[in-house]
Swiss-Prot record:
Belongs to the methyltransferase superfamily. UbiG/COQ3 family. Pathway: Cofactor biosynthesis; ubiquinone biosynthesis. The lineage of its organism: Bacteria, Pseudomonadati, Pseudomonadota, Alphaproteobacteria, Hyphomicrobiales. The gene is ubiG. SUPFAM superfamilies: S-adenosyl-L-methionine-dependent methyltransferases. The keyword Ribosomal protein does not apply. This is Ubiquinone biosynthesis O-methyltransferase. NCBIfam families: UbiG (TIGR01983).
Length: 247
């Protein structure tokens, strides 16, 4: 049972992203790296869902009848393609401003997405269950990562899939994701990341195992400055992505 006195909410993180919420859908703005990163993670998510859940990869709507939760959805950069692929999508974020931006953009594009201003632990108490949960670039922004994994795992159906993308706690990640991206290249606003919140893959795997989730695949995602693109990699020292299945 989830302890109601604990929270995943880090108000300083919520305030930070609320201040720049208007930038979510600007591919040349403060979320430019995420827009560039998105095609790589989308391709991986689509490929693995089709493989693990035996969906037709060439179908226009391979995710039809699948219920997907994108927790920490921001402005909806993942929710919208999931909806276009046929999924029933719930997008949850602790920032009301983010959710307002997401709702407006979905309406402008004729997409039906269930957006909610809430936290993982609050949503978990409602008893809703999902086939897929996306925890993308969010675990490094929560106040209590143990509670966050516990709450999201609780909402996943047996044999359901959880995708987690985050940053490794290495000097290389500190140098590239914080010093490089925030202070030198100014790709991200200063203060976007806190190195102390970065997780090593083994730490995240242990947390998942404690909540009946087994990692079935893992990849690194690296930036290529020569062609200004993000690609899958064996190098998990900076950005990495885990796929876990619930027993």
């Amino acid at each position: 049972m989830i302890n109601e006195t604990r929270t995943t909410l880090d108000q300083s993180e919520v305030d930070h992203f609320s201040r720049i919420a208007a930038e979510w859908w600007n591919p040349h703005g403060k979320f430019r790296p995420l827009h560039q990163f998105n095609p790589t993670r989308l391709a991986y998510i689509r490929e693995k869902i089709c493989l693990e859940l035996h969906r037709d990869p060439v179908s226009l709507k391979p995710f039809e009848n699948l219920k997907i939760l994108d927790i920490g959805c921001g402005g909806g950069l993942l929710c919208e393609p999931m909806a276009r692929l046929g999924a029933m999508v719930v997008g949850a974020d602790a920032s009301q401003t983010n959710i307002e931006v997401a709702k407006i953009h979905a309406a402008q594009n004729g997409l039906s997405i269930d957006y909610r201003t809430t936290t993982a632990e609050a949503l978990a108490t409602e008893g809703e269950q999902f086939d897929i949960i996306l925890n993308m670039e969010v675990v490094e922004h929560v106040a209590d990562v143990n509670l966050f994994i516990e709450a999201t795992a609780k909402m996943l159906k047996p044999q359901g899939l959880m995708f987690i993308s985050t940053l490794n706690r290495t000097w290389k990640a500190w140098g590239l994701a914080i010093i490089g991206a925030e202070y030198i290249l100014r790709w991200l606003p200063k203060g976007t990341h806190n190195y102390k919140k970065f997780l090593k893959p083994r730490e995240l795997k242990n947390l998942l195992l404690q909540n009946a989730l087994t990692v079935v695949d893992e990849i690194g995602v690296t930036y290529n400055p020569l062609n200004d693109s993000w690609n899958r990699s064996k190098d998990m020292n900076v950005n990495y992505l885990l796929l876990a299945k619930k027993s």
